[in-house]
Amino acid sequence: MAGASLNSPESKESVLDFTFSPEEEAFRQEVVAFLEKEGPQEWHKKKVSFFDMSGQENWIAVHRDMSRKLGARGWLSLHWPREYGGQGLSPFYRLILREELARYHCPGYHSLSVDFVAPAILLKGSEELKKRHLPGIASGEIMWCEGLSEPGHGSDMAAIETYAREDGDSYVVNGQKIWTTYAHFAEWMFLLARTDRQAQPNYRGLTFFLVDMCTPGITVNPIINMAGHHDFNEVFFDDVRIPKENIVDSVNRGWYVAMSVLDSERTSDLGYAIAGTLLNDIVEGAREMDMLDSGDKIRMAELVAECEVARLIHYHVTCMQAQGKDTSYEAAMCKLLGFESIQNVAEFGLKVFRNYGLLSDTSPFAPLYGRISSCYLRSFGHSMEAGTSEIDRDIIAQRGLGLPRLR
């Protein structure tokens, strides 16, 4: 971004300039041209969103195919260091790519792999782990899932009980993870497990492992969400043996590895772009069906403003990331505003289309191919990713406003 930085330090009021550079605008046009030629045309026609993806026929194959195409162009590693196969570009190139993928209703960008695992390995992994795992992520060939949440603990990641016992040159893992997105087809998992039951505070006893999902002892059971789609899973570990060489950083340092990359995950999915695209589709569909009244127009204007605020905050955070600044509470604002915008827009769609908005994609009378009800139902679960909205508010209160913890 041409002015994606603070103005001169001499200025009393530093102003952020969100004008994209000619090179960035050229990249945007390159992405648009690529999607028009290589993107899944049926998905574009049906306006399939991030939240409808798993409800589509052959969606895993489409997702993987697009991921490989993005990887072949080097677009999954735009901001990685050149020495590890990246292009060394600013985070704004990733933002531009994600914006256009959302507008085109295109899958293929697997943020768990690109924006959580890859940064963790780049920041904390050994050279061997970098050589072994980064090429598969950059090419789009290898998909990852996350082993964080557990039954009974919810958002309290420090209370993880899944236990890894040292045994020779390996650790033997027993326990359970839940709400594990895409575990049913991912090749690898990044797993946070307890290696010290006596550690105080308890978060100091966690270790970050990389786990081959084909390892004996792993069982994956599906969890069908409210929309009837299969994204989530529960994963059981029964004497699963993980080589010590698959530890990121070192034993009992897993909490710090996870915390170092959570900001990247919180800013990866561009909730404002998903919400804005859905809002445009709702307005277009409602106009065709002549279902917009004056009250709807007022609410629509409010939602446009809400999405715009979320977008500008996201740009601000991306500026900070480009400068290497800490973005802990700003990233929480990005995720909170983005995903709550999606919920608000989907709720608006239900109001605009009335009973028709409740219809699923199996009904020929469903507006937008049933996306309204699907997005509404899915948005609540996805708002919990990378921390619930309550955790986001707590982070903003503590780190942004200097207030005590809310809980």
Sequence positions of predicted segments:
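Glycine-rich beta->alpha junctions and the first turn(s) of the following alpha-helix
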Residues: G3, F18-F20, I218-L312, H382
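Internal helix-loop-helix
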Residues: R64-E141, Y182-W188, C307, Q321-Y329, ...
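C-terminal helix-coil-helix/basic helical segment that borders enzyme active sites and/or dimer interfaces
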Residues: W43-S54, R287-S294, E308-P364
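Amphipathic, small/basic residue-rich leader segments at the start of a protein or domain
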Residues: A2-S111, R132-S139, S268, D296-A301, ...
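Glycine-rich phosphate/cofactor-binding loops in nucleotide/flavin-utilizing enzymes
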Residues: D17, R28, F92, I96-E100, ...
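A short, Trp-centered hydrophobic/proline-enriched beta-strand micro-motif
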Residues: G140-L148, L192
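A short core secondary-structure module
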Residues: S170, N174-N221
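A structural signal for short hydrophobic beta-strand segments in well-ordered beta-sheet cores
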Residues: T162-R165
